[in-house]
Regions:
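Cationic, low-complexity basic patches in intrinsically disordered or flexible, solvent-exposed regions
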Residues: 9, 18
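Intrinsic low-complexity, disordered N-terminal segments enriched in polar/charged/small residues
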Residues: 13-15
Length: 161
């Protein structure tokens, strides 16, 4: 399999280039990521992310089911945050603002330590995987939001020029 470089691909593919520093064996100080979603969507997002950029550390998932005890799930999120926090902060990503996963995550926000980013999508995750080793929490969360918005498109409008 040939690896393509950003210069060889059209558009702004730099957002999708894997960061291979993770595989060099060093323990990195980085922003932790916790994916909290309805059902098992969080696990699938993690699998898709790792398919695109390779294995990731300091990432956890929490699935919220319709019959789950909310206090138990809140504690699961709290434990996941503690597990991925290396001191650079944690971004909790949720699938939909106002939904149960988002509301539980918001109850755990801490200024400059734990932030919640709702509207999870794959471009957002890929961007965060790229920037979380070298960015401050506040910067990374905005970059993730920007990437998530940037890649929402109506194909026919783009192709029509």
């Amino acid at each position: 399999m040939r690896v393509l470089h950003a210069a060889e691909l059209p558009g702004t593919v730099a957002d999708f280039q894997p960061d291979r520093r993770e595989s060099q064996g060093a323990i990195a100080i980085m922003i932790g990521l916790v994916l909290v979603t309805h059902g098992r969507l969080a696990e699938e997002f993690r699998a898709a992310l790792e398919h695109v950029v390779g294995p990731q550390s300091a990432i956890a998932t929490v699935a919220i089911g319709p019959e789950d005890d909310l206090e138990t799930r809140r504690n699961d999120i709290l434990e996941a945050v503690a597990a991925v926090d290396s001191g650079s902060g944690v971004i909790i990503l949720t699938d939909m603002f106002g939904g149960t996963p988002s509301n539980l995550a918001i109850s755990l926000m801490k200024p400059a330590k734990v932030e919640v980013l709702a509207g999870l999508n794959l471009p957002m995750l890929v961007k965060l995987a790229r920037v979380r080793k070298d960015s401050a929490l506040e910067t990374a969360v905005v970059q993730g939001q920007d990437a998530g918005r940037k890649y929402i498109n109506i194909a026919s409008r783009i192709l029509a020029g």
